[in-house]
Amino acid sequence: MDRIRLGILQVNHDKSETIGDHFPDDAHRFRDLFDALEQRFAYRVYMTIGDELPGSLDEQDAFLITGSPLSVLDEHSFLPPLYDFIRACDSARKPLIGTCFGHQAIAVALGGRVERAAAGWNVGIEATHFIENTSFMTDAQRDLGFYVFHEDHVSALPPQARLIGRGDFCPTAAFAVGNHIMTTQAHPEFTDRFMRAVLDDCVGLLGQDGHAEATASLDRGRNDGPLFSRWITRFILNHF
């Protein structure tokens, strides 16, 4: 059997000396995550932040939209075409995964709402409680810890979506549409080393207290990103 083709729509390009020069970019972090589980997709990266999108849904078997420090609440030239692409995936029931920014973009494209969280930044490790038992969630574990870094959140689901996971800070932590779209507000592709570097780089944004609180959550929390990546793999494989 040929490898399943996974198109990764990258909506971030970190060129900073502190982070971008020392860590793989978003698409490569996902590749590393999947490859570590010996699920080697045939990857194609689309630099959507540079207005690149697939020319056809048939170019790939499934798609994944990455996270980004950008906000769907702002005006970006790539957003309207990305929303059209998301709606096309939904209409064709094409397997689509969204993480962080991708989670929010899918919500907006399909008629949901994203707002700035009144409580401010949610940073560190947060547990998502999955409230739905589906075929791709074959592990008994239902409370998964994830790295998170966001200020915006999905405040209203699209009409056709259903909530599948919630967190203490983020009530809409994960949702699904049919059996072809699945999203998470979290970053399953982050590693502990990467997250700590990002936190250290964002002391000015978070403040000393915010940085200390987020760092403490890493020390006491658990990262279940690899487990969730197995769920993503099963979610995609269910279509083939």
Locations of the language-model features?
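N-terminal beta1-alpha1 cap of cysteine-dependent amidohydrolase-like domains
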Residues: 1-77, 81-84, 90-92, 212-240
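Amide-donor transfer/coupling interface in amidating biosynthetic enzymes
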Residues: 2-11, 29, 91, 130-240
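Short, glycine/charged-enriched secondary-structure capping and boundary segments
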Residues: 21-24, 58-60, 77-80, 111-114, ...
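Conserved beta-strand termini and adjacent loop/short-helix elements that scaffold enzyme active sites
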Residues: 46-48, 117, 149, 166
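Short glycine-/acidic-enriched loop or helix-start segments at secondary-structure transitions
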Residues: 18, 74-75, 107-109, 158, ...
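A short acidic, often aromatic-flanked loop/helix-cap motif at beta-alpha or helix-coil junctions
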Residues: 50-54, 122-123, 154-155, 171-172
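Cysteine-nucleophile active-site neighborhood
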Residues: 66-132
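Conserved beta-strand segments of alpha/beta enzyme cores
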Residues: 42-44, 113, 145, 162
